[in-house]
Amino acid sequence: NGGGWFLAFDDSRQQLVASVLDSLPVCIEVDTDYGLVGIVHADIGGNDWAGFVSDLVGPISNNRRKAMLEDALWCRDRIQGERSGNVDGLHAMYVGHTPVKQATALGNVIYVDTGAVFGRSITLACIQGEGSGNTFSRAA
């Protein structure tokens, strides 16, 4: 879904892009007036934010860390199983990766990938201040 631009690069440029992407955080935490908000690409594969974050700082050879990285990038278990339990330790967790017709909440997990890569709308979420918790979609 949209990765053709990367494959068109020569090896050295692909390595440069990979190096830049490797320097990005796996997850983001934002302290808000309502509590801690987590942001991750796909999901955390469980319901324990602190445990997820703790496992991410382990050595790269650690199998648990590898599993957490895999979940952060690819996991769809929660949305495919329509599990609505909250992620402990967070006010809300915002995720993407799985296109949904409109922003969708399962417990305190909010799915905001509304398929812009496929020509559908792009969704933004307000996590602080007036309008916090609201999502806004706009045609791509």
Show which residues each predicted segment covers.
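Active-site neighborhood of divalent metal-dependent phosphoester bond hydrolases
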Residues: 1-29, 34-36, 60, 64-70, ...
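Generic secondary-structure microfeatures
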Residues: 25, 32, 41-48, 98
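Short, well-ordered beta-strand micro-motif
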Residues: 29, 39-41, 124-128
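Short, surface-exposed beta-edge/turn micro-motifs
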Residues: 35-37, 90-91
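Active-site-proximal beta-strand elements of phosphoester/diester hydrolases
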Residues: 37-43, 110-112
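Short catalytic/ligand-binding loop motif for oxyanion handling, primarily in non-cytosolic enzymes
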Residues: 38-39, 46-49, 101-104, 119
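Active-site-proximal segments of metal-dependent phosphoesterases and phosphodiesterases across multiple
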Residues: 44-87
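Conserved beta-sheet core of the metallophosphoesterase superfamily
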Residues: 77-139
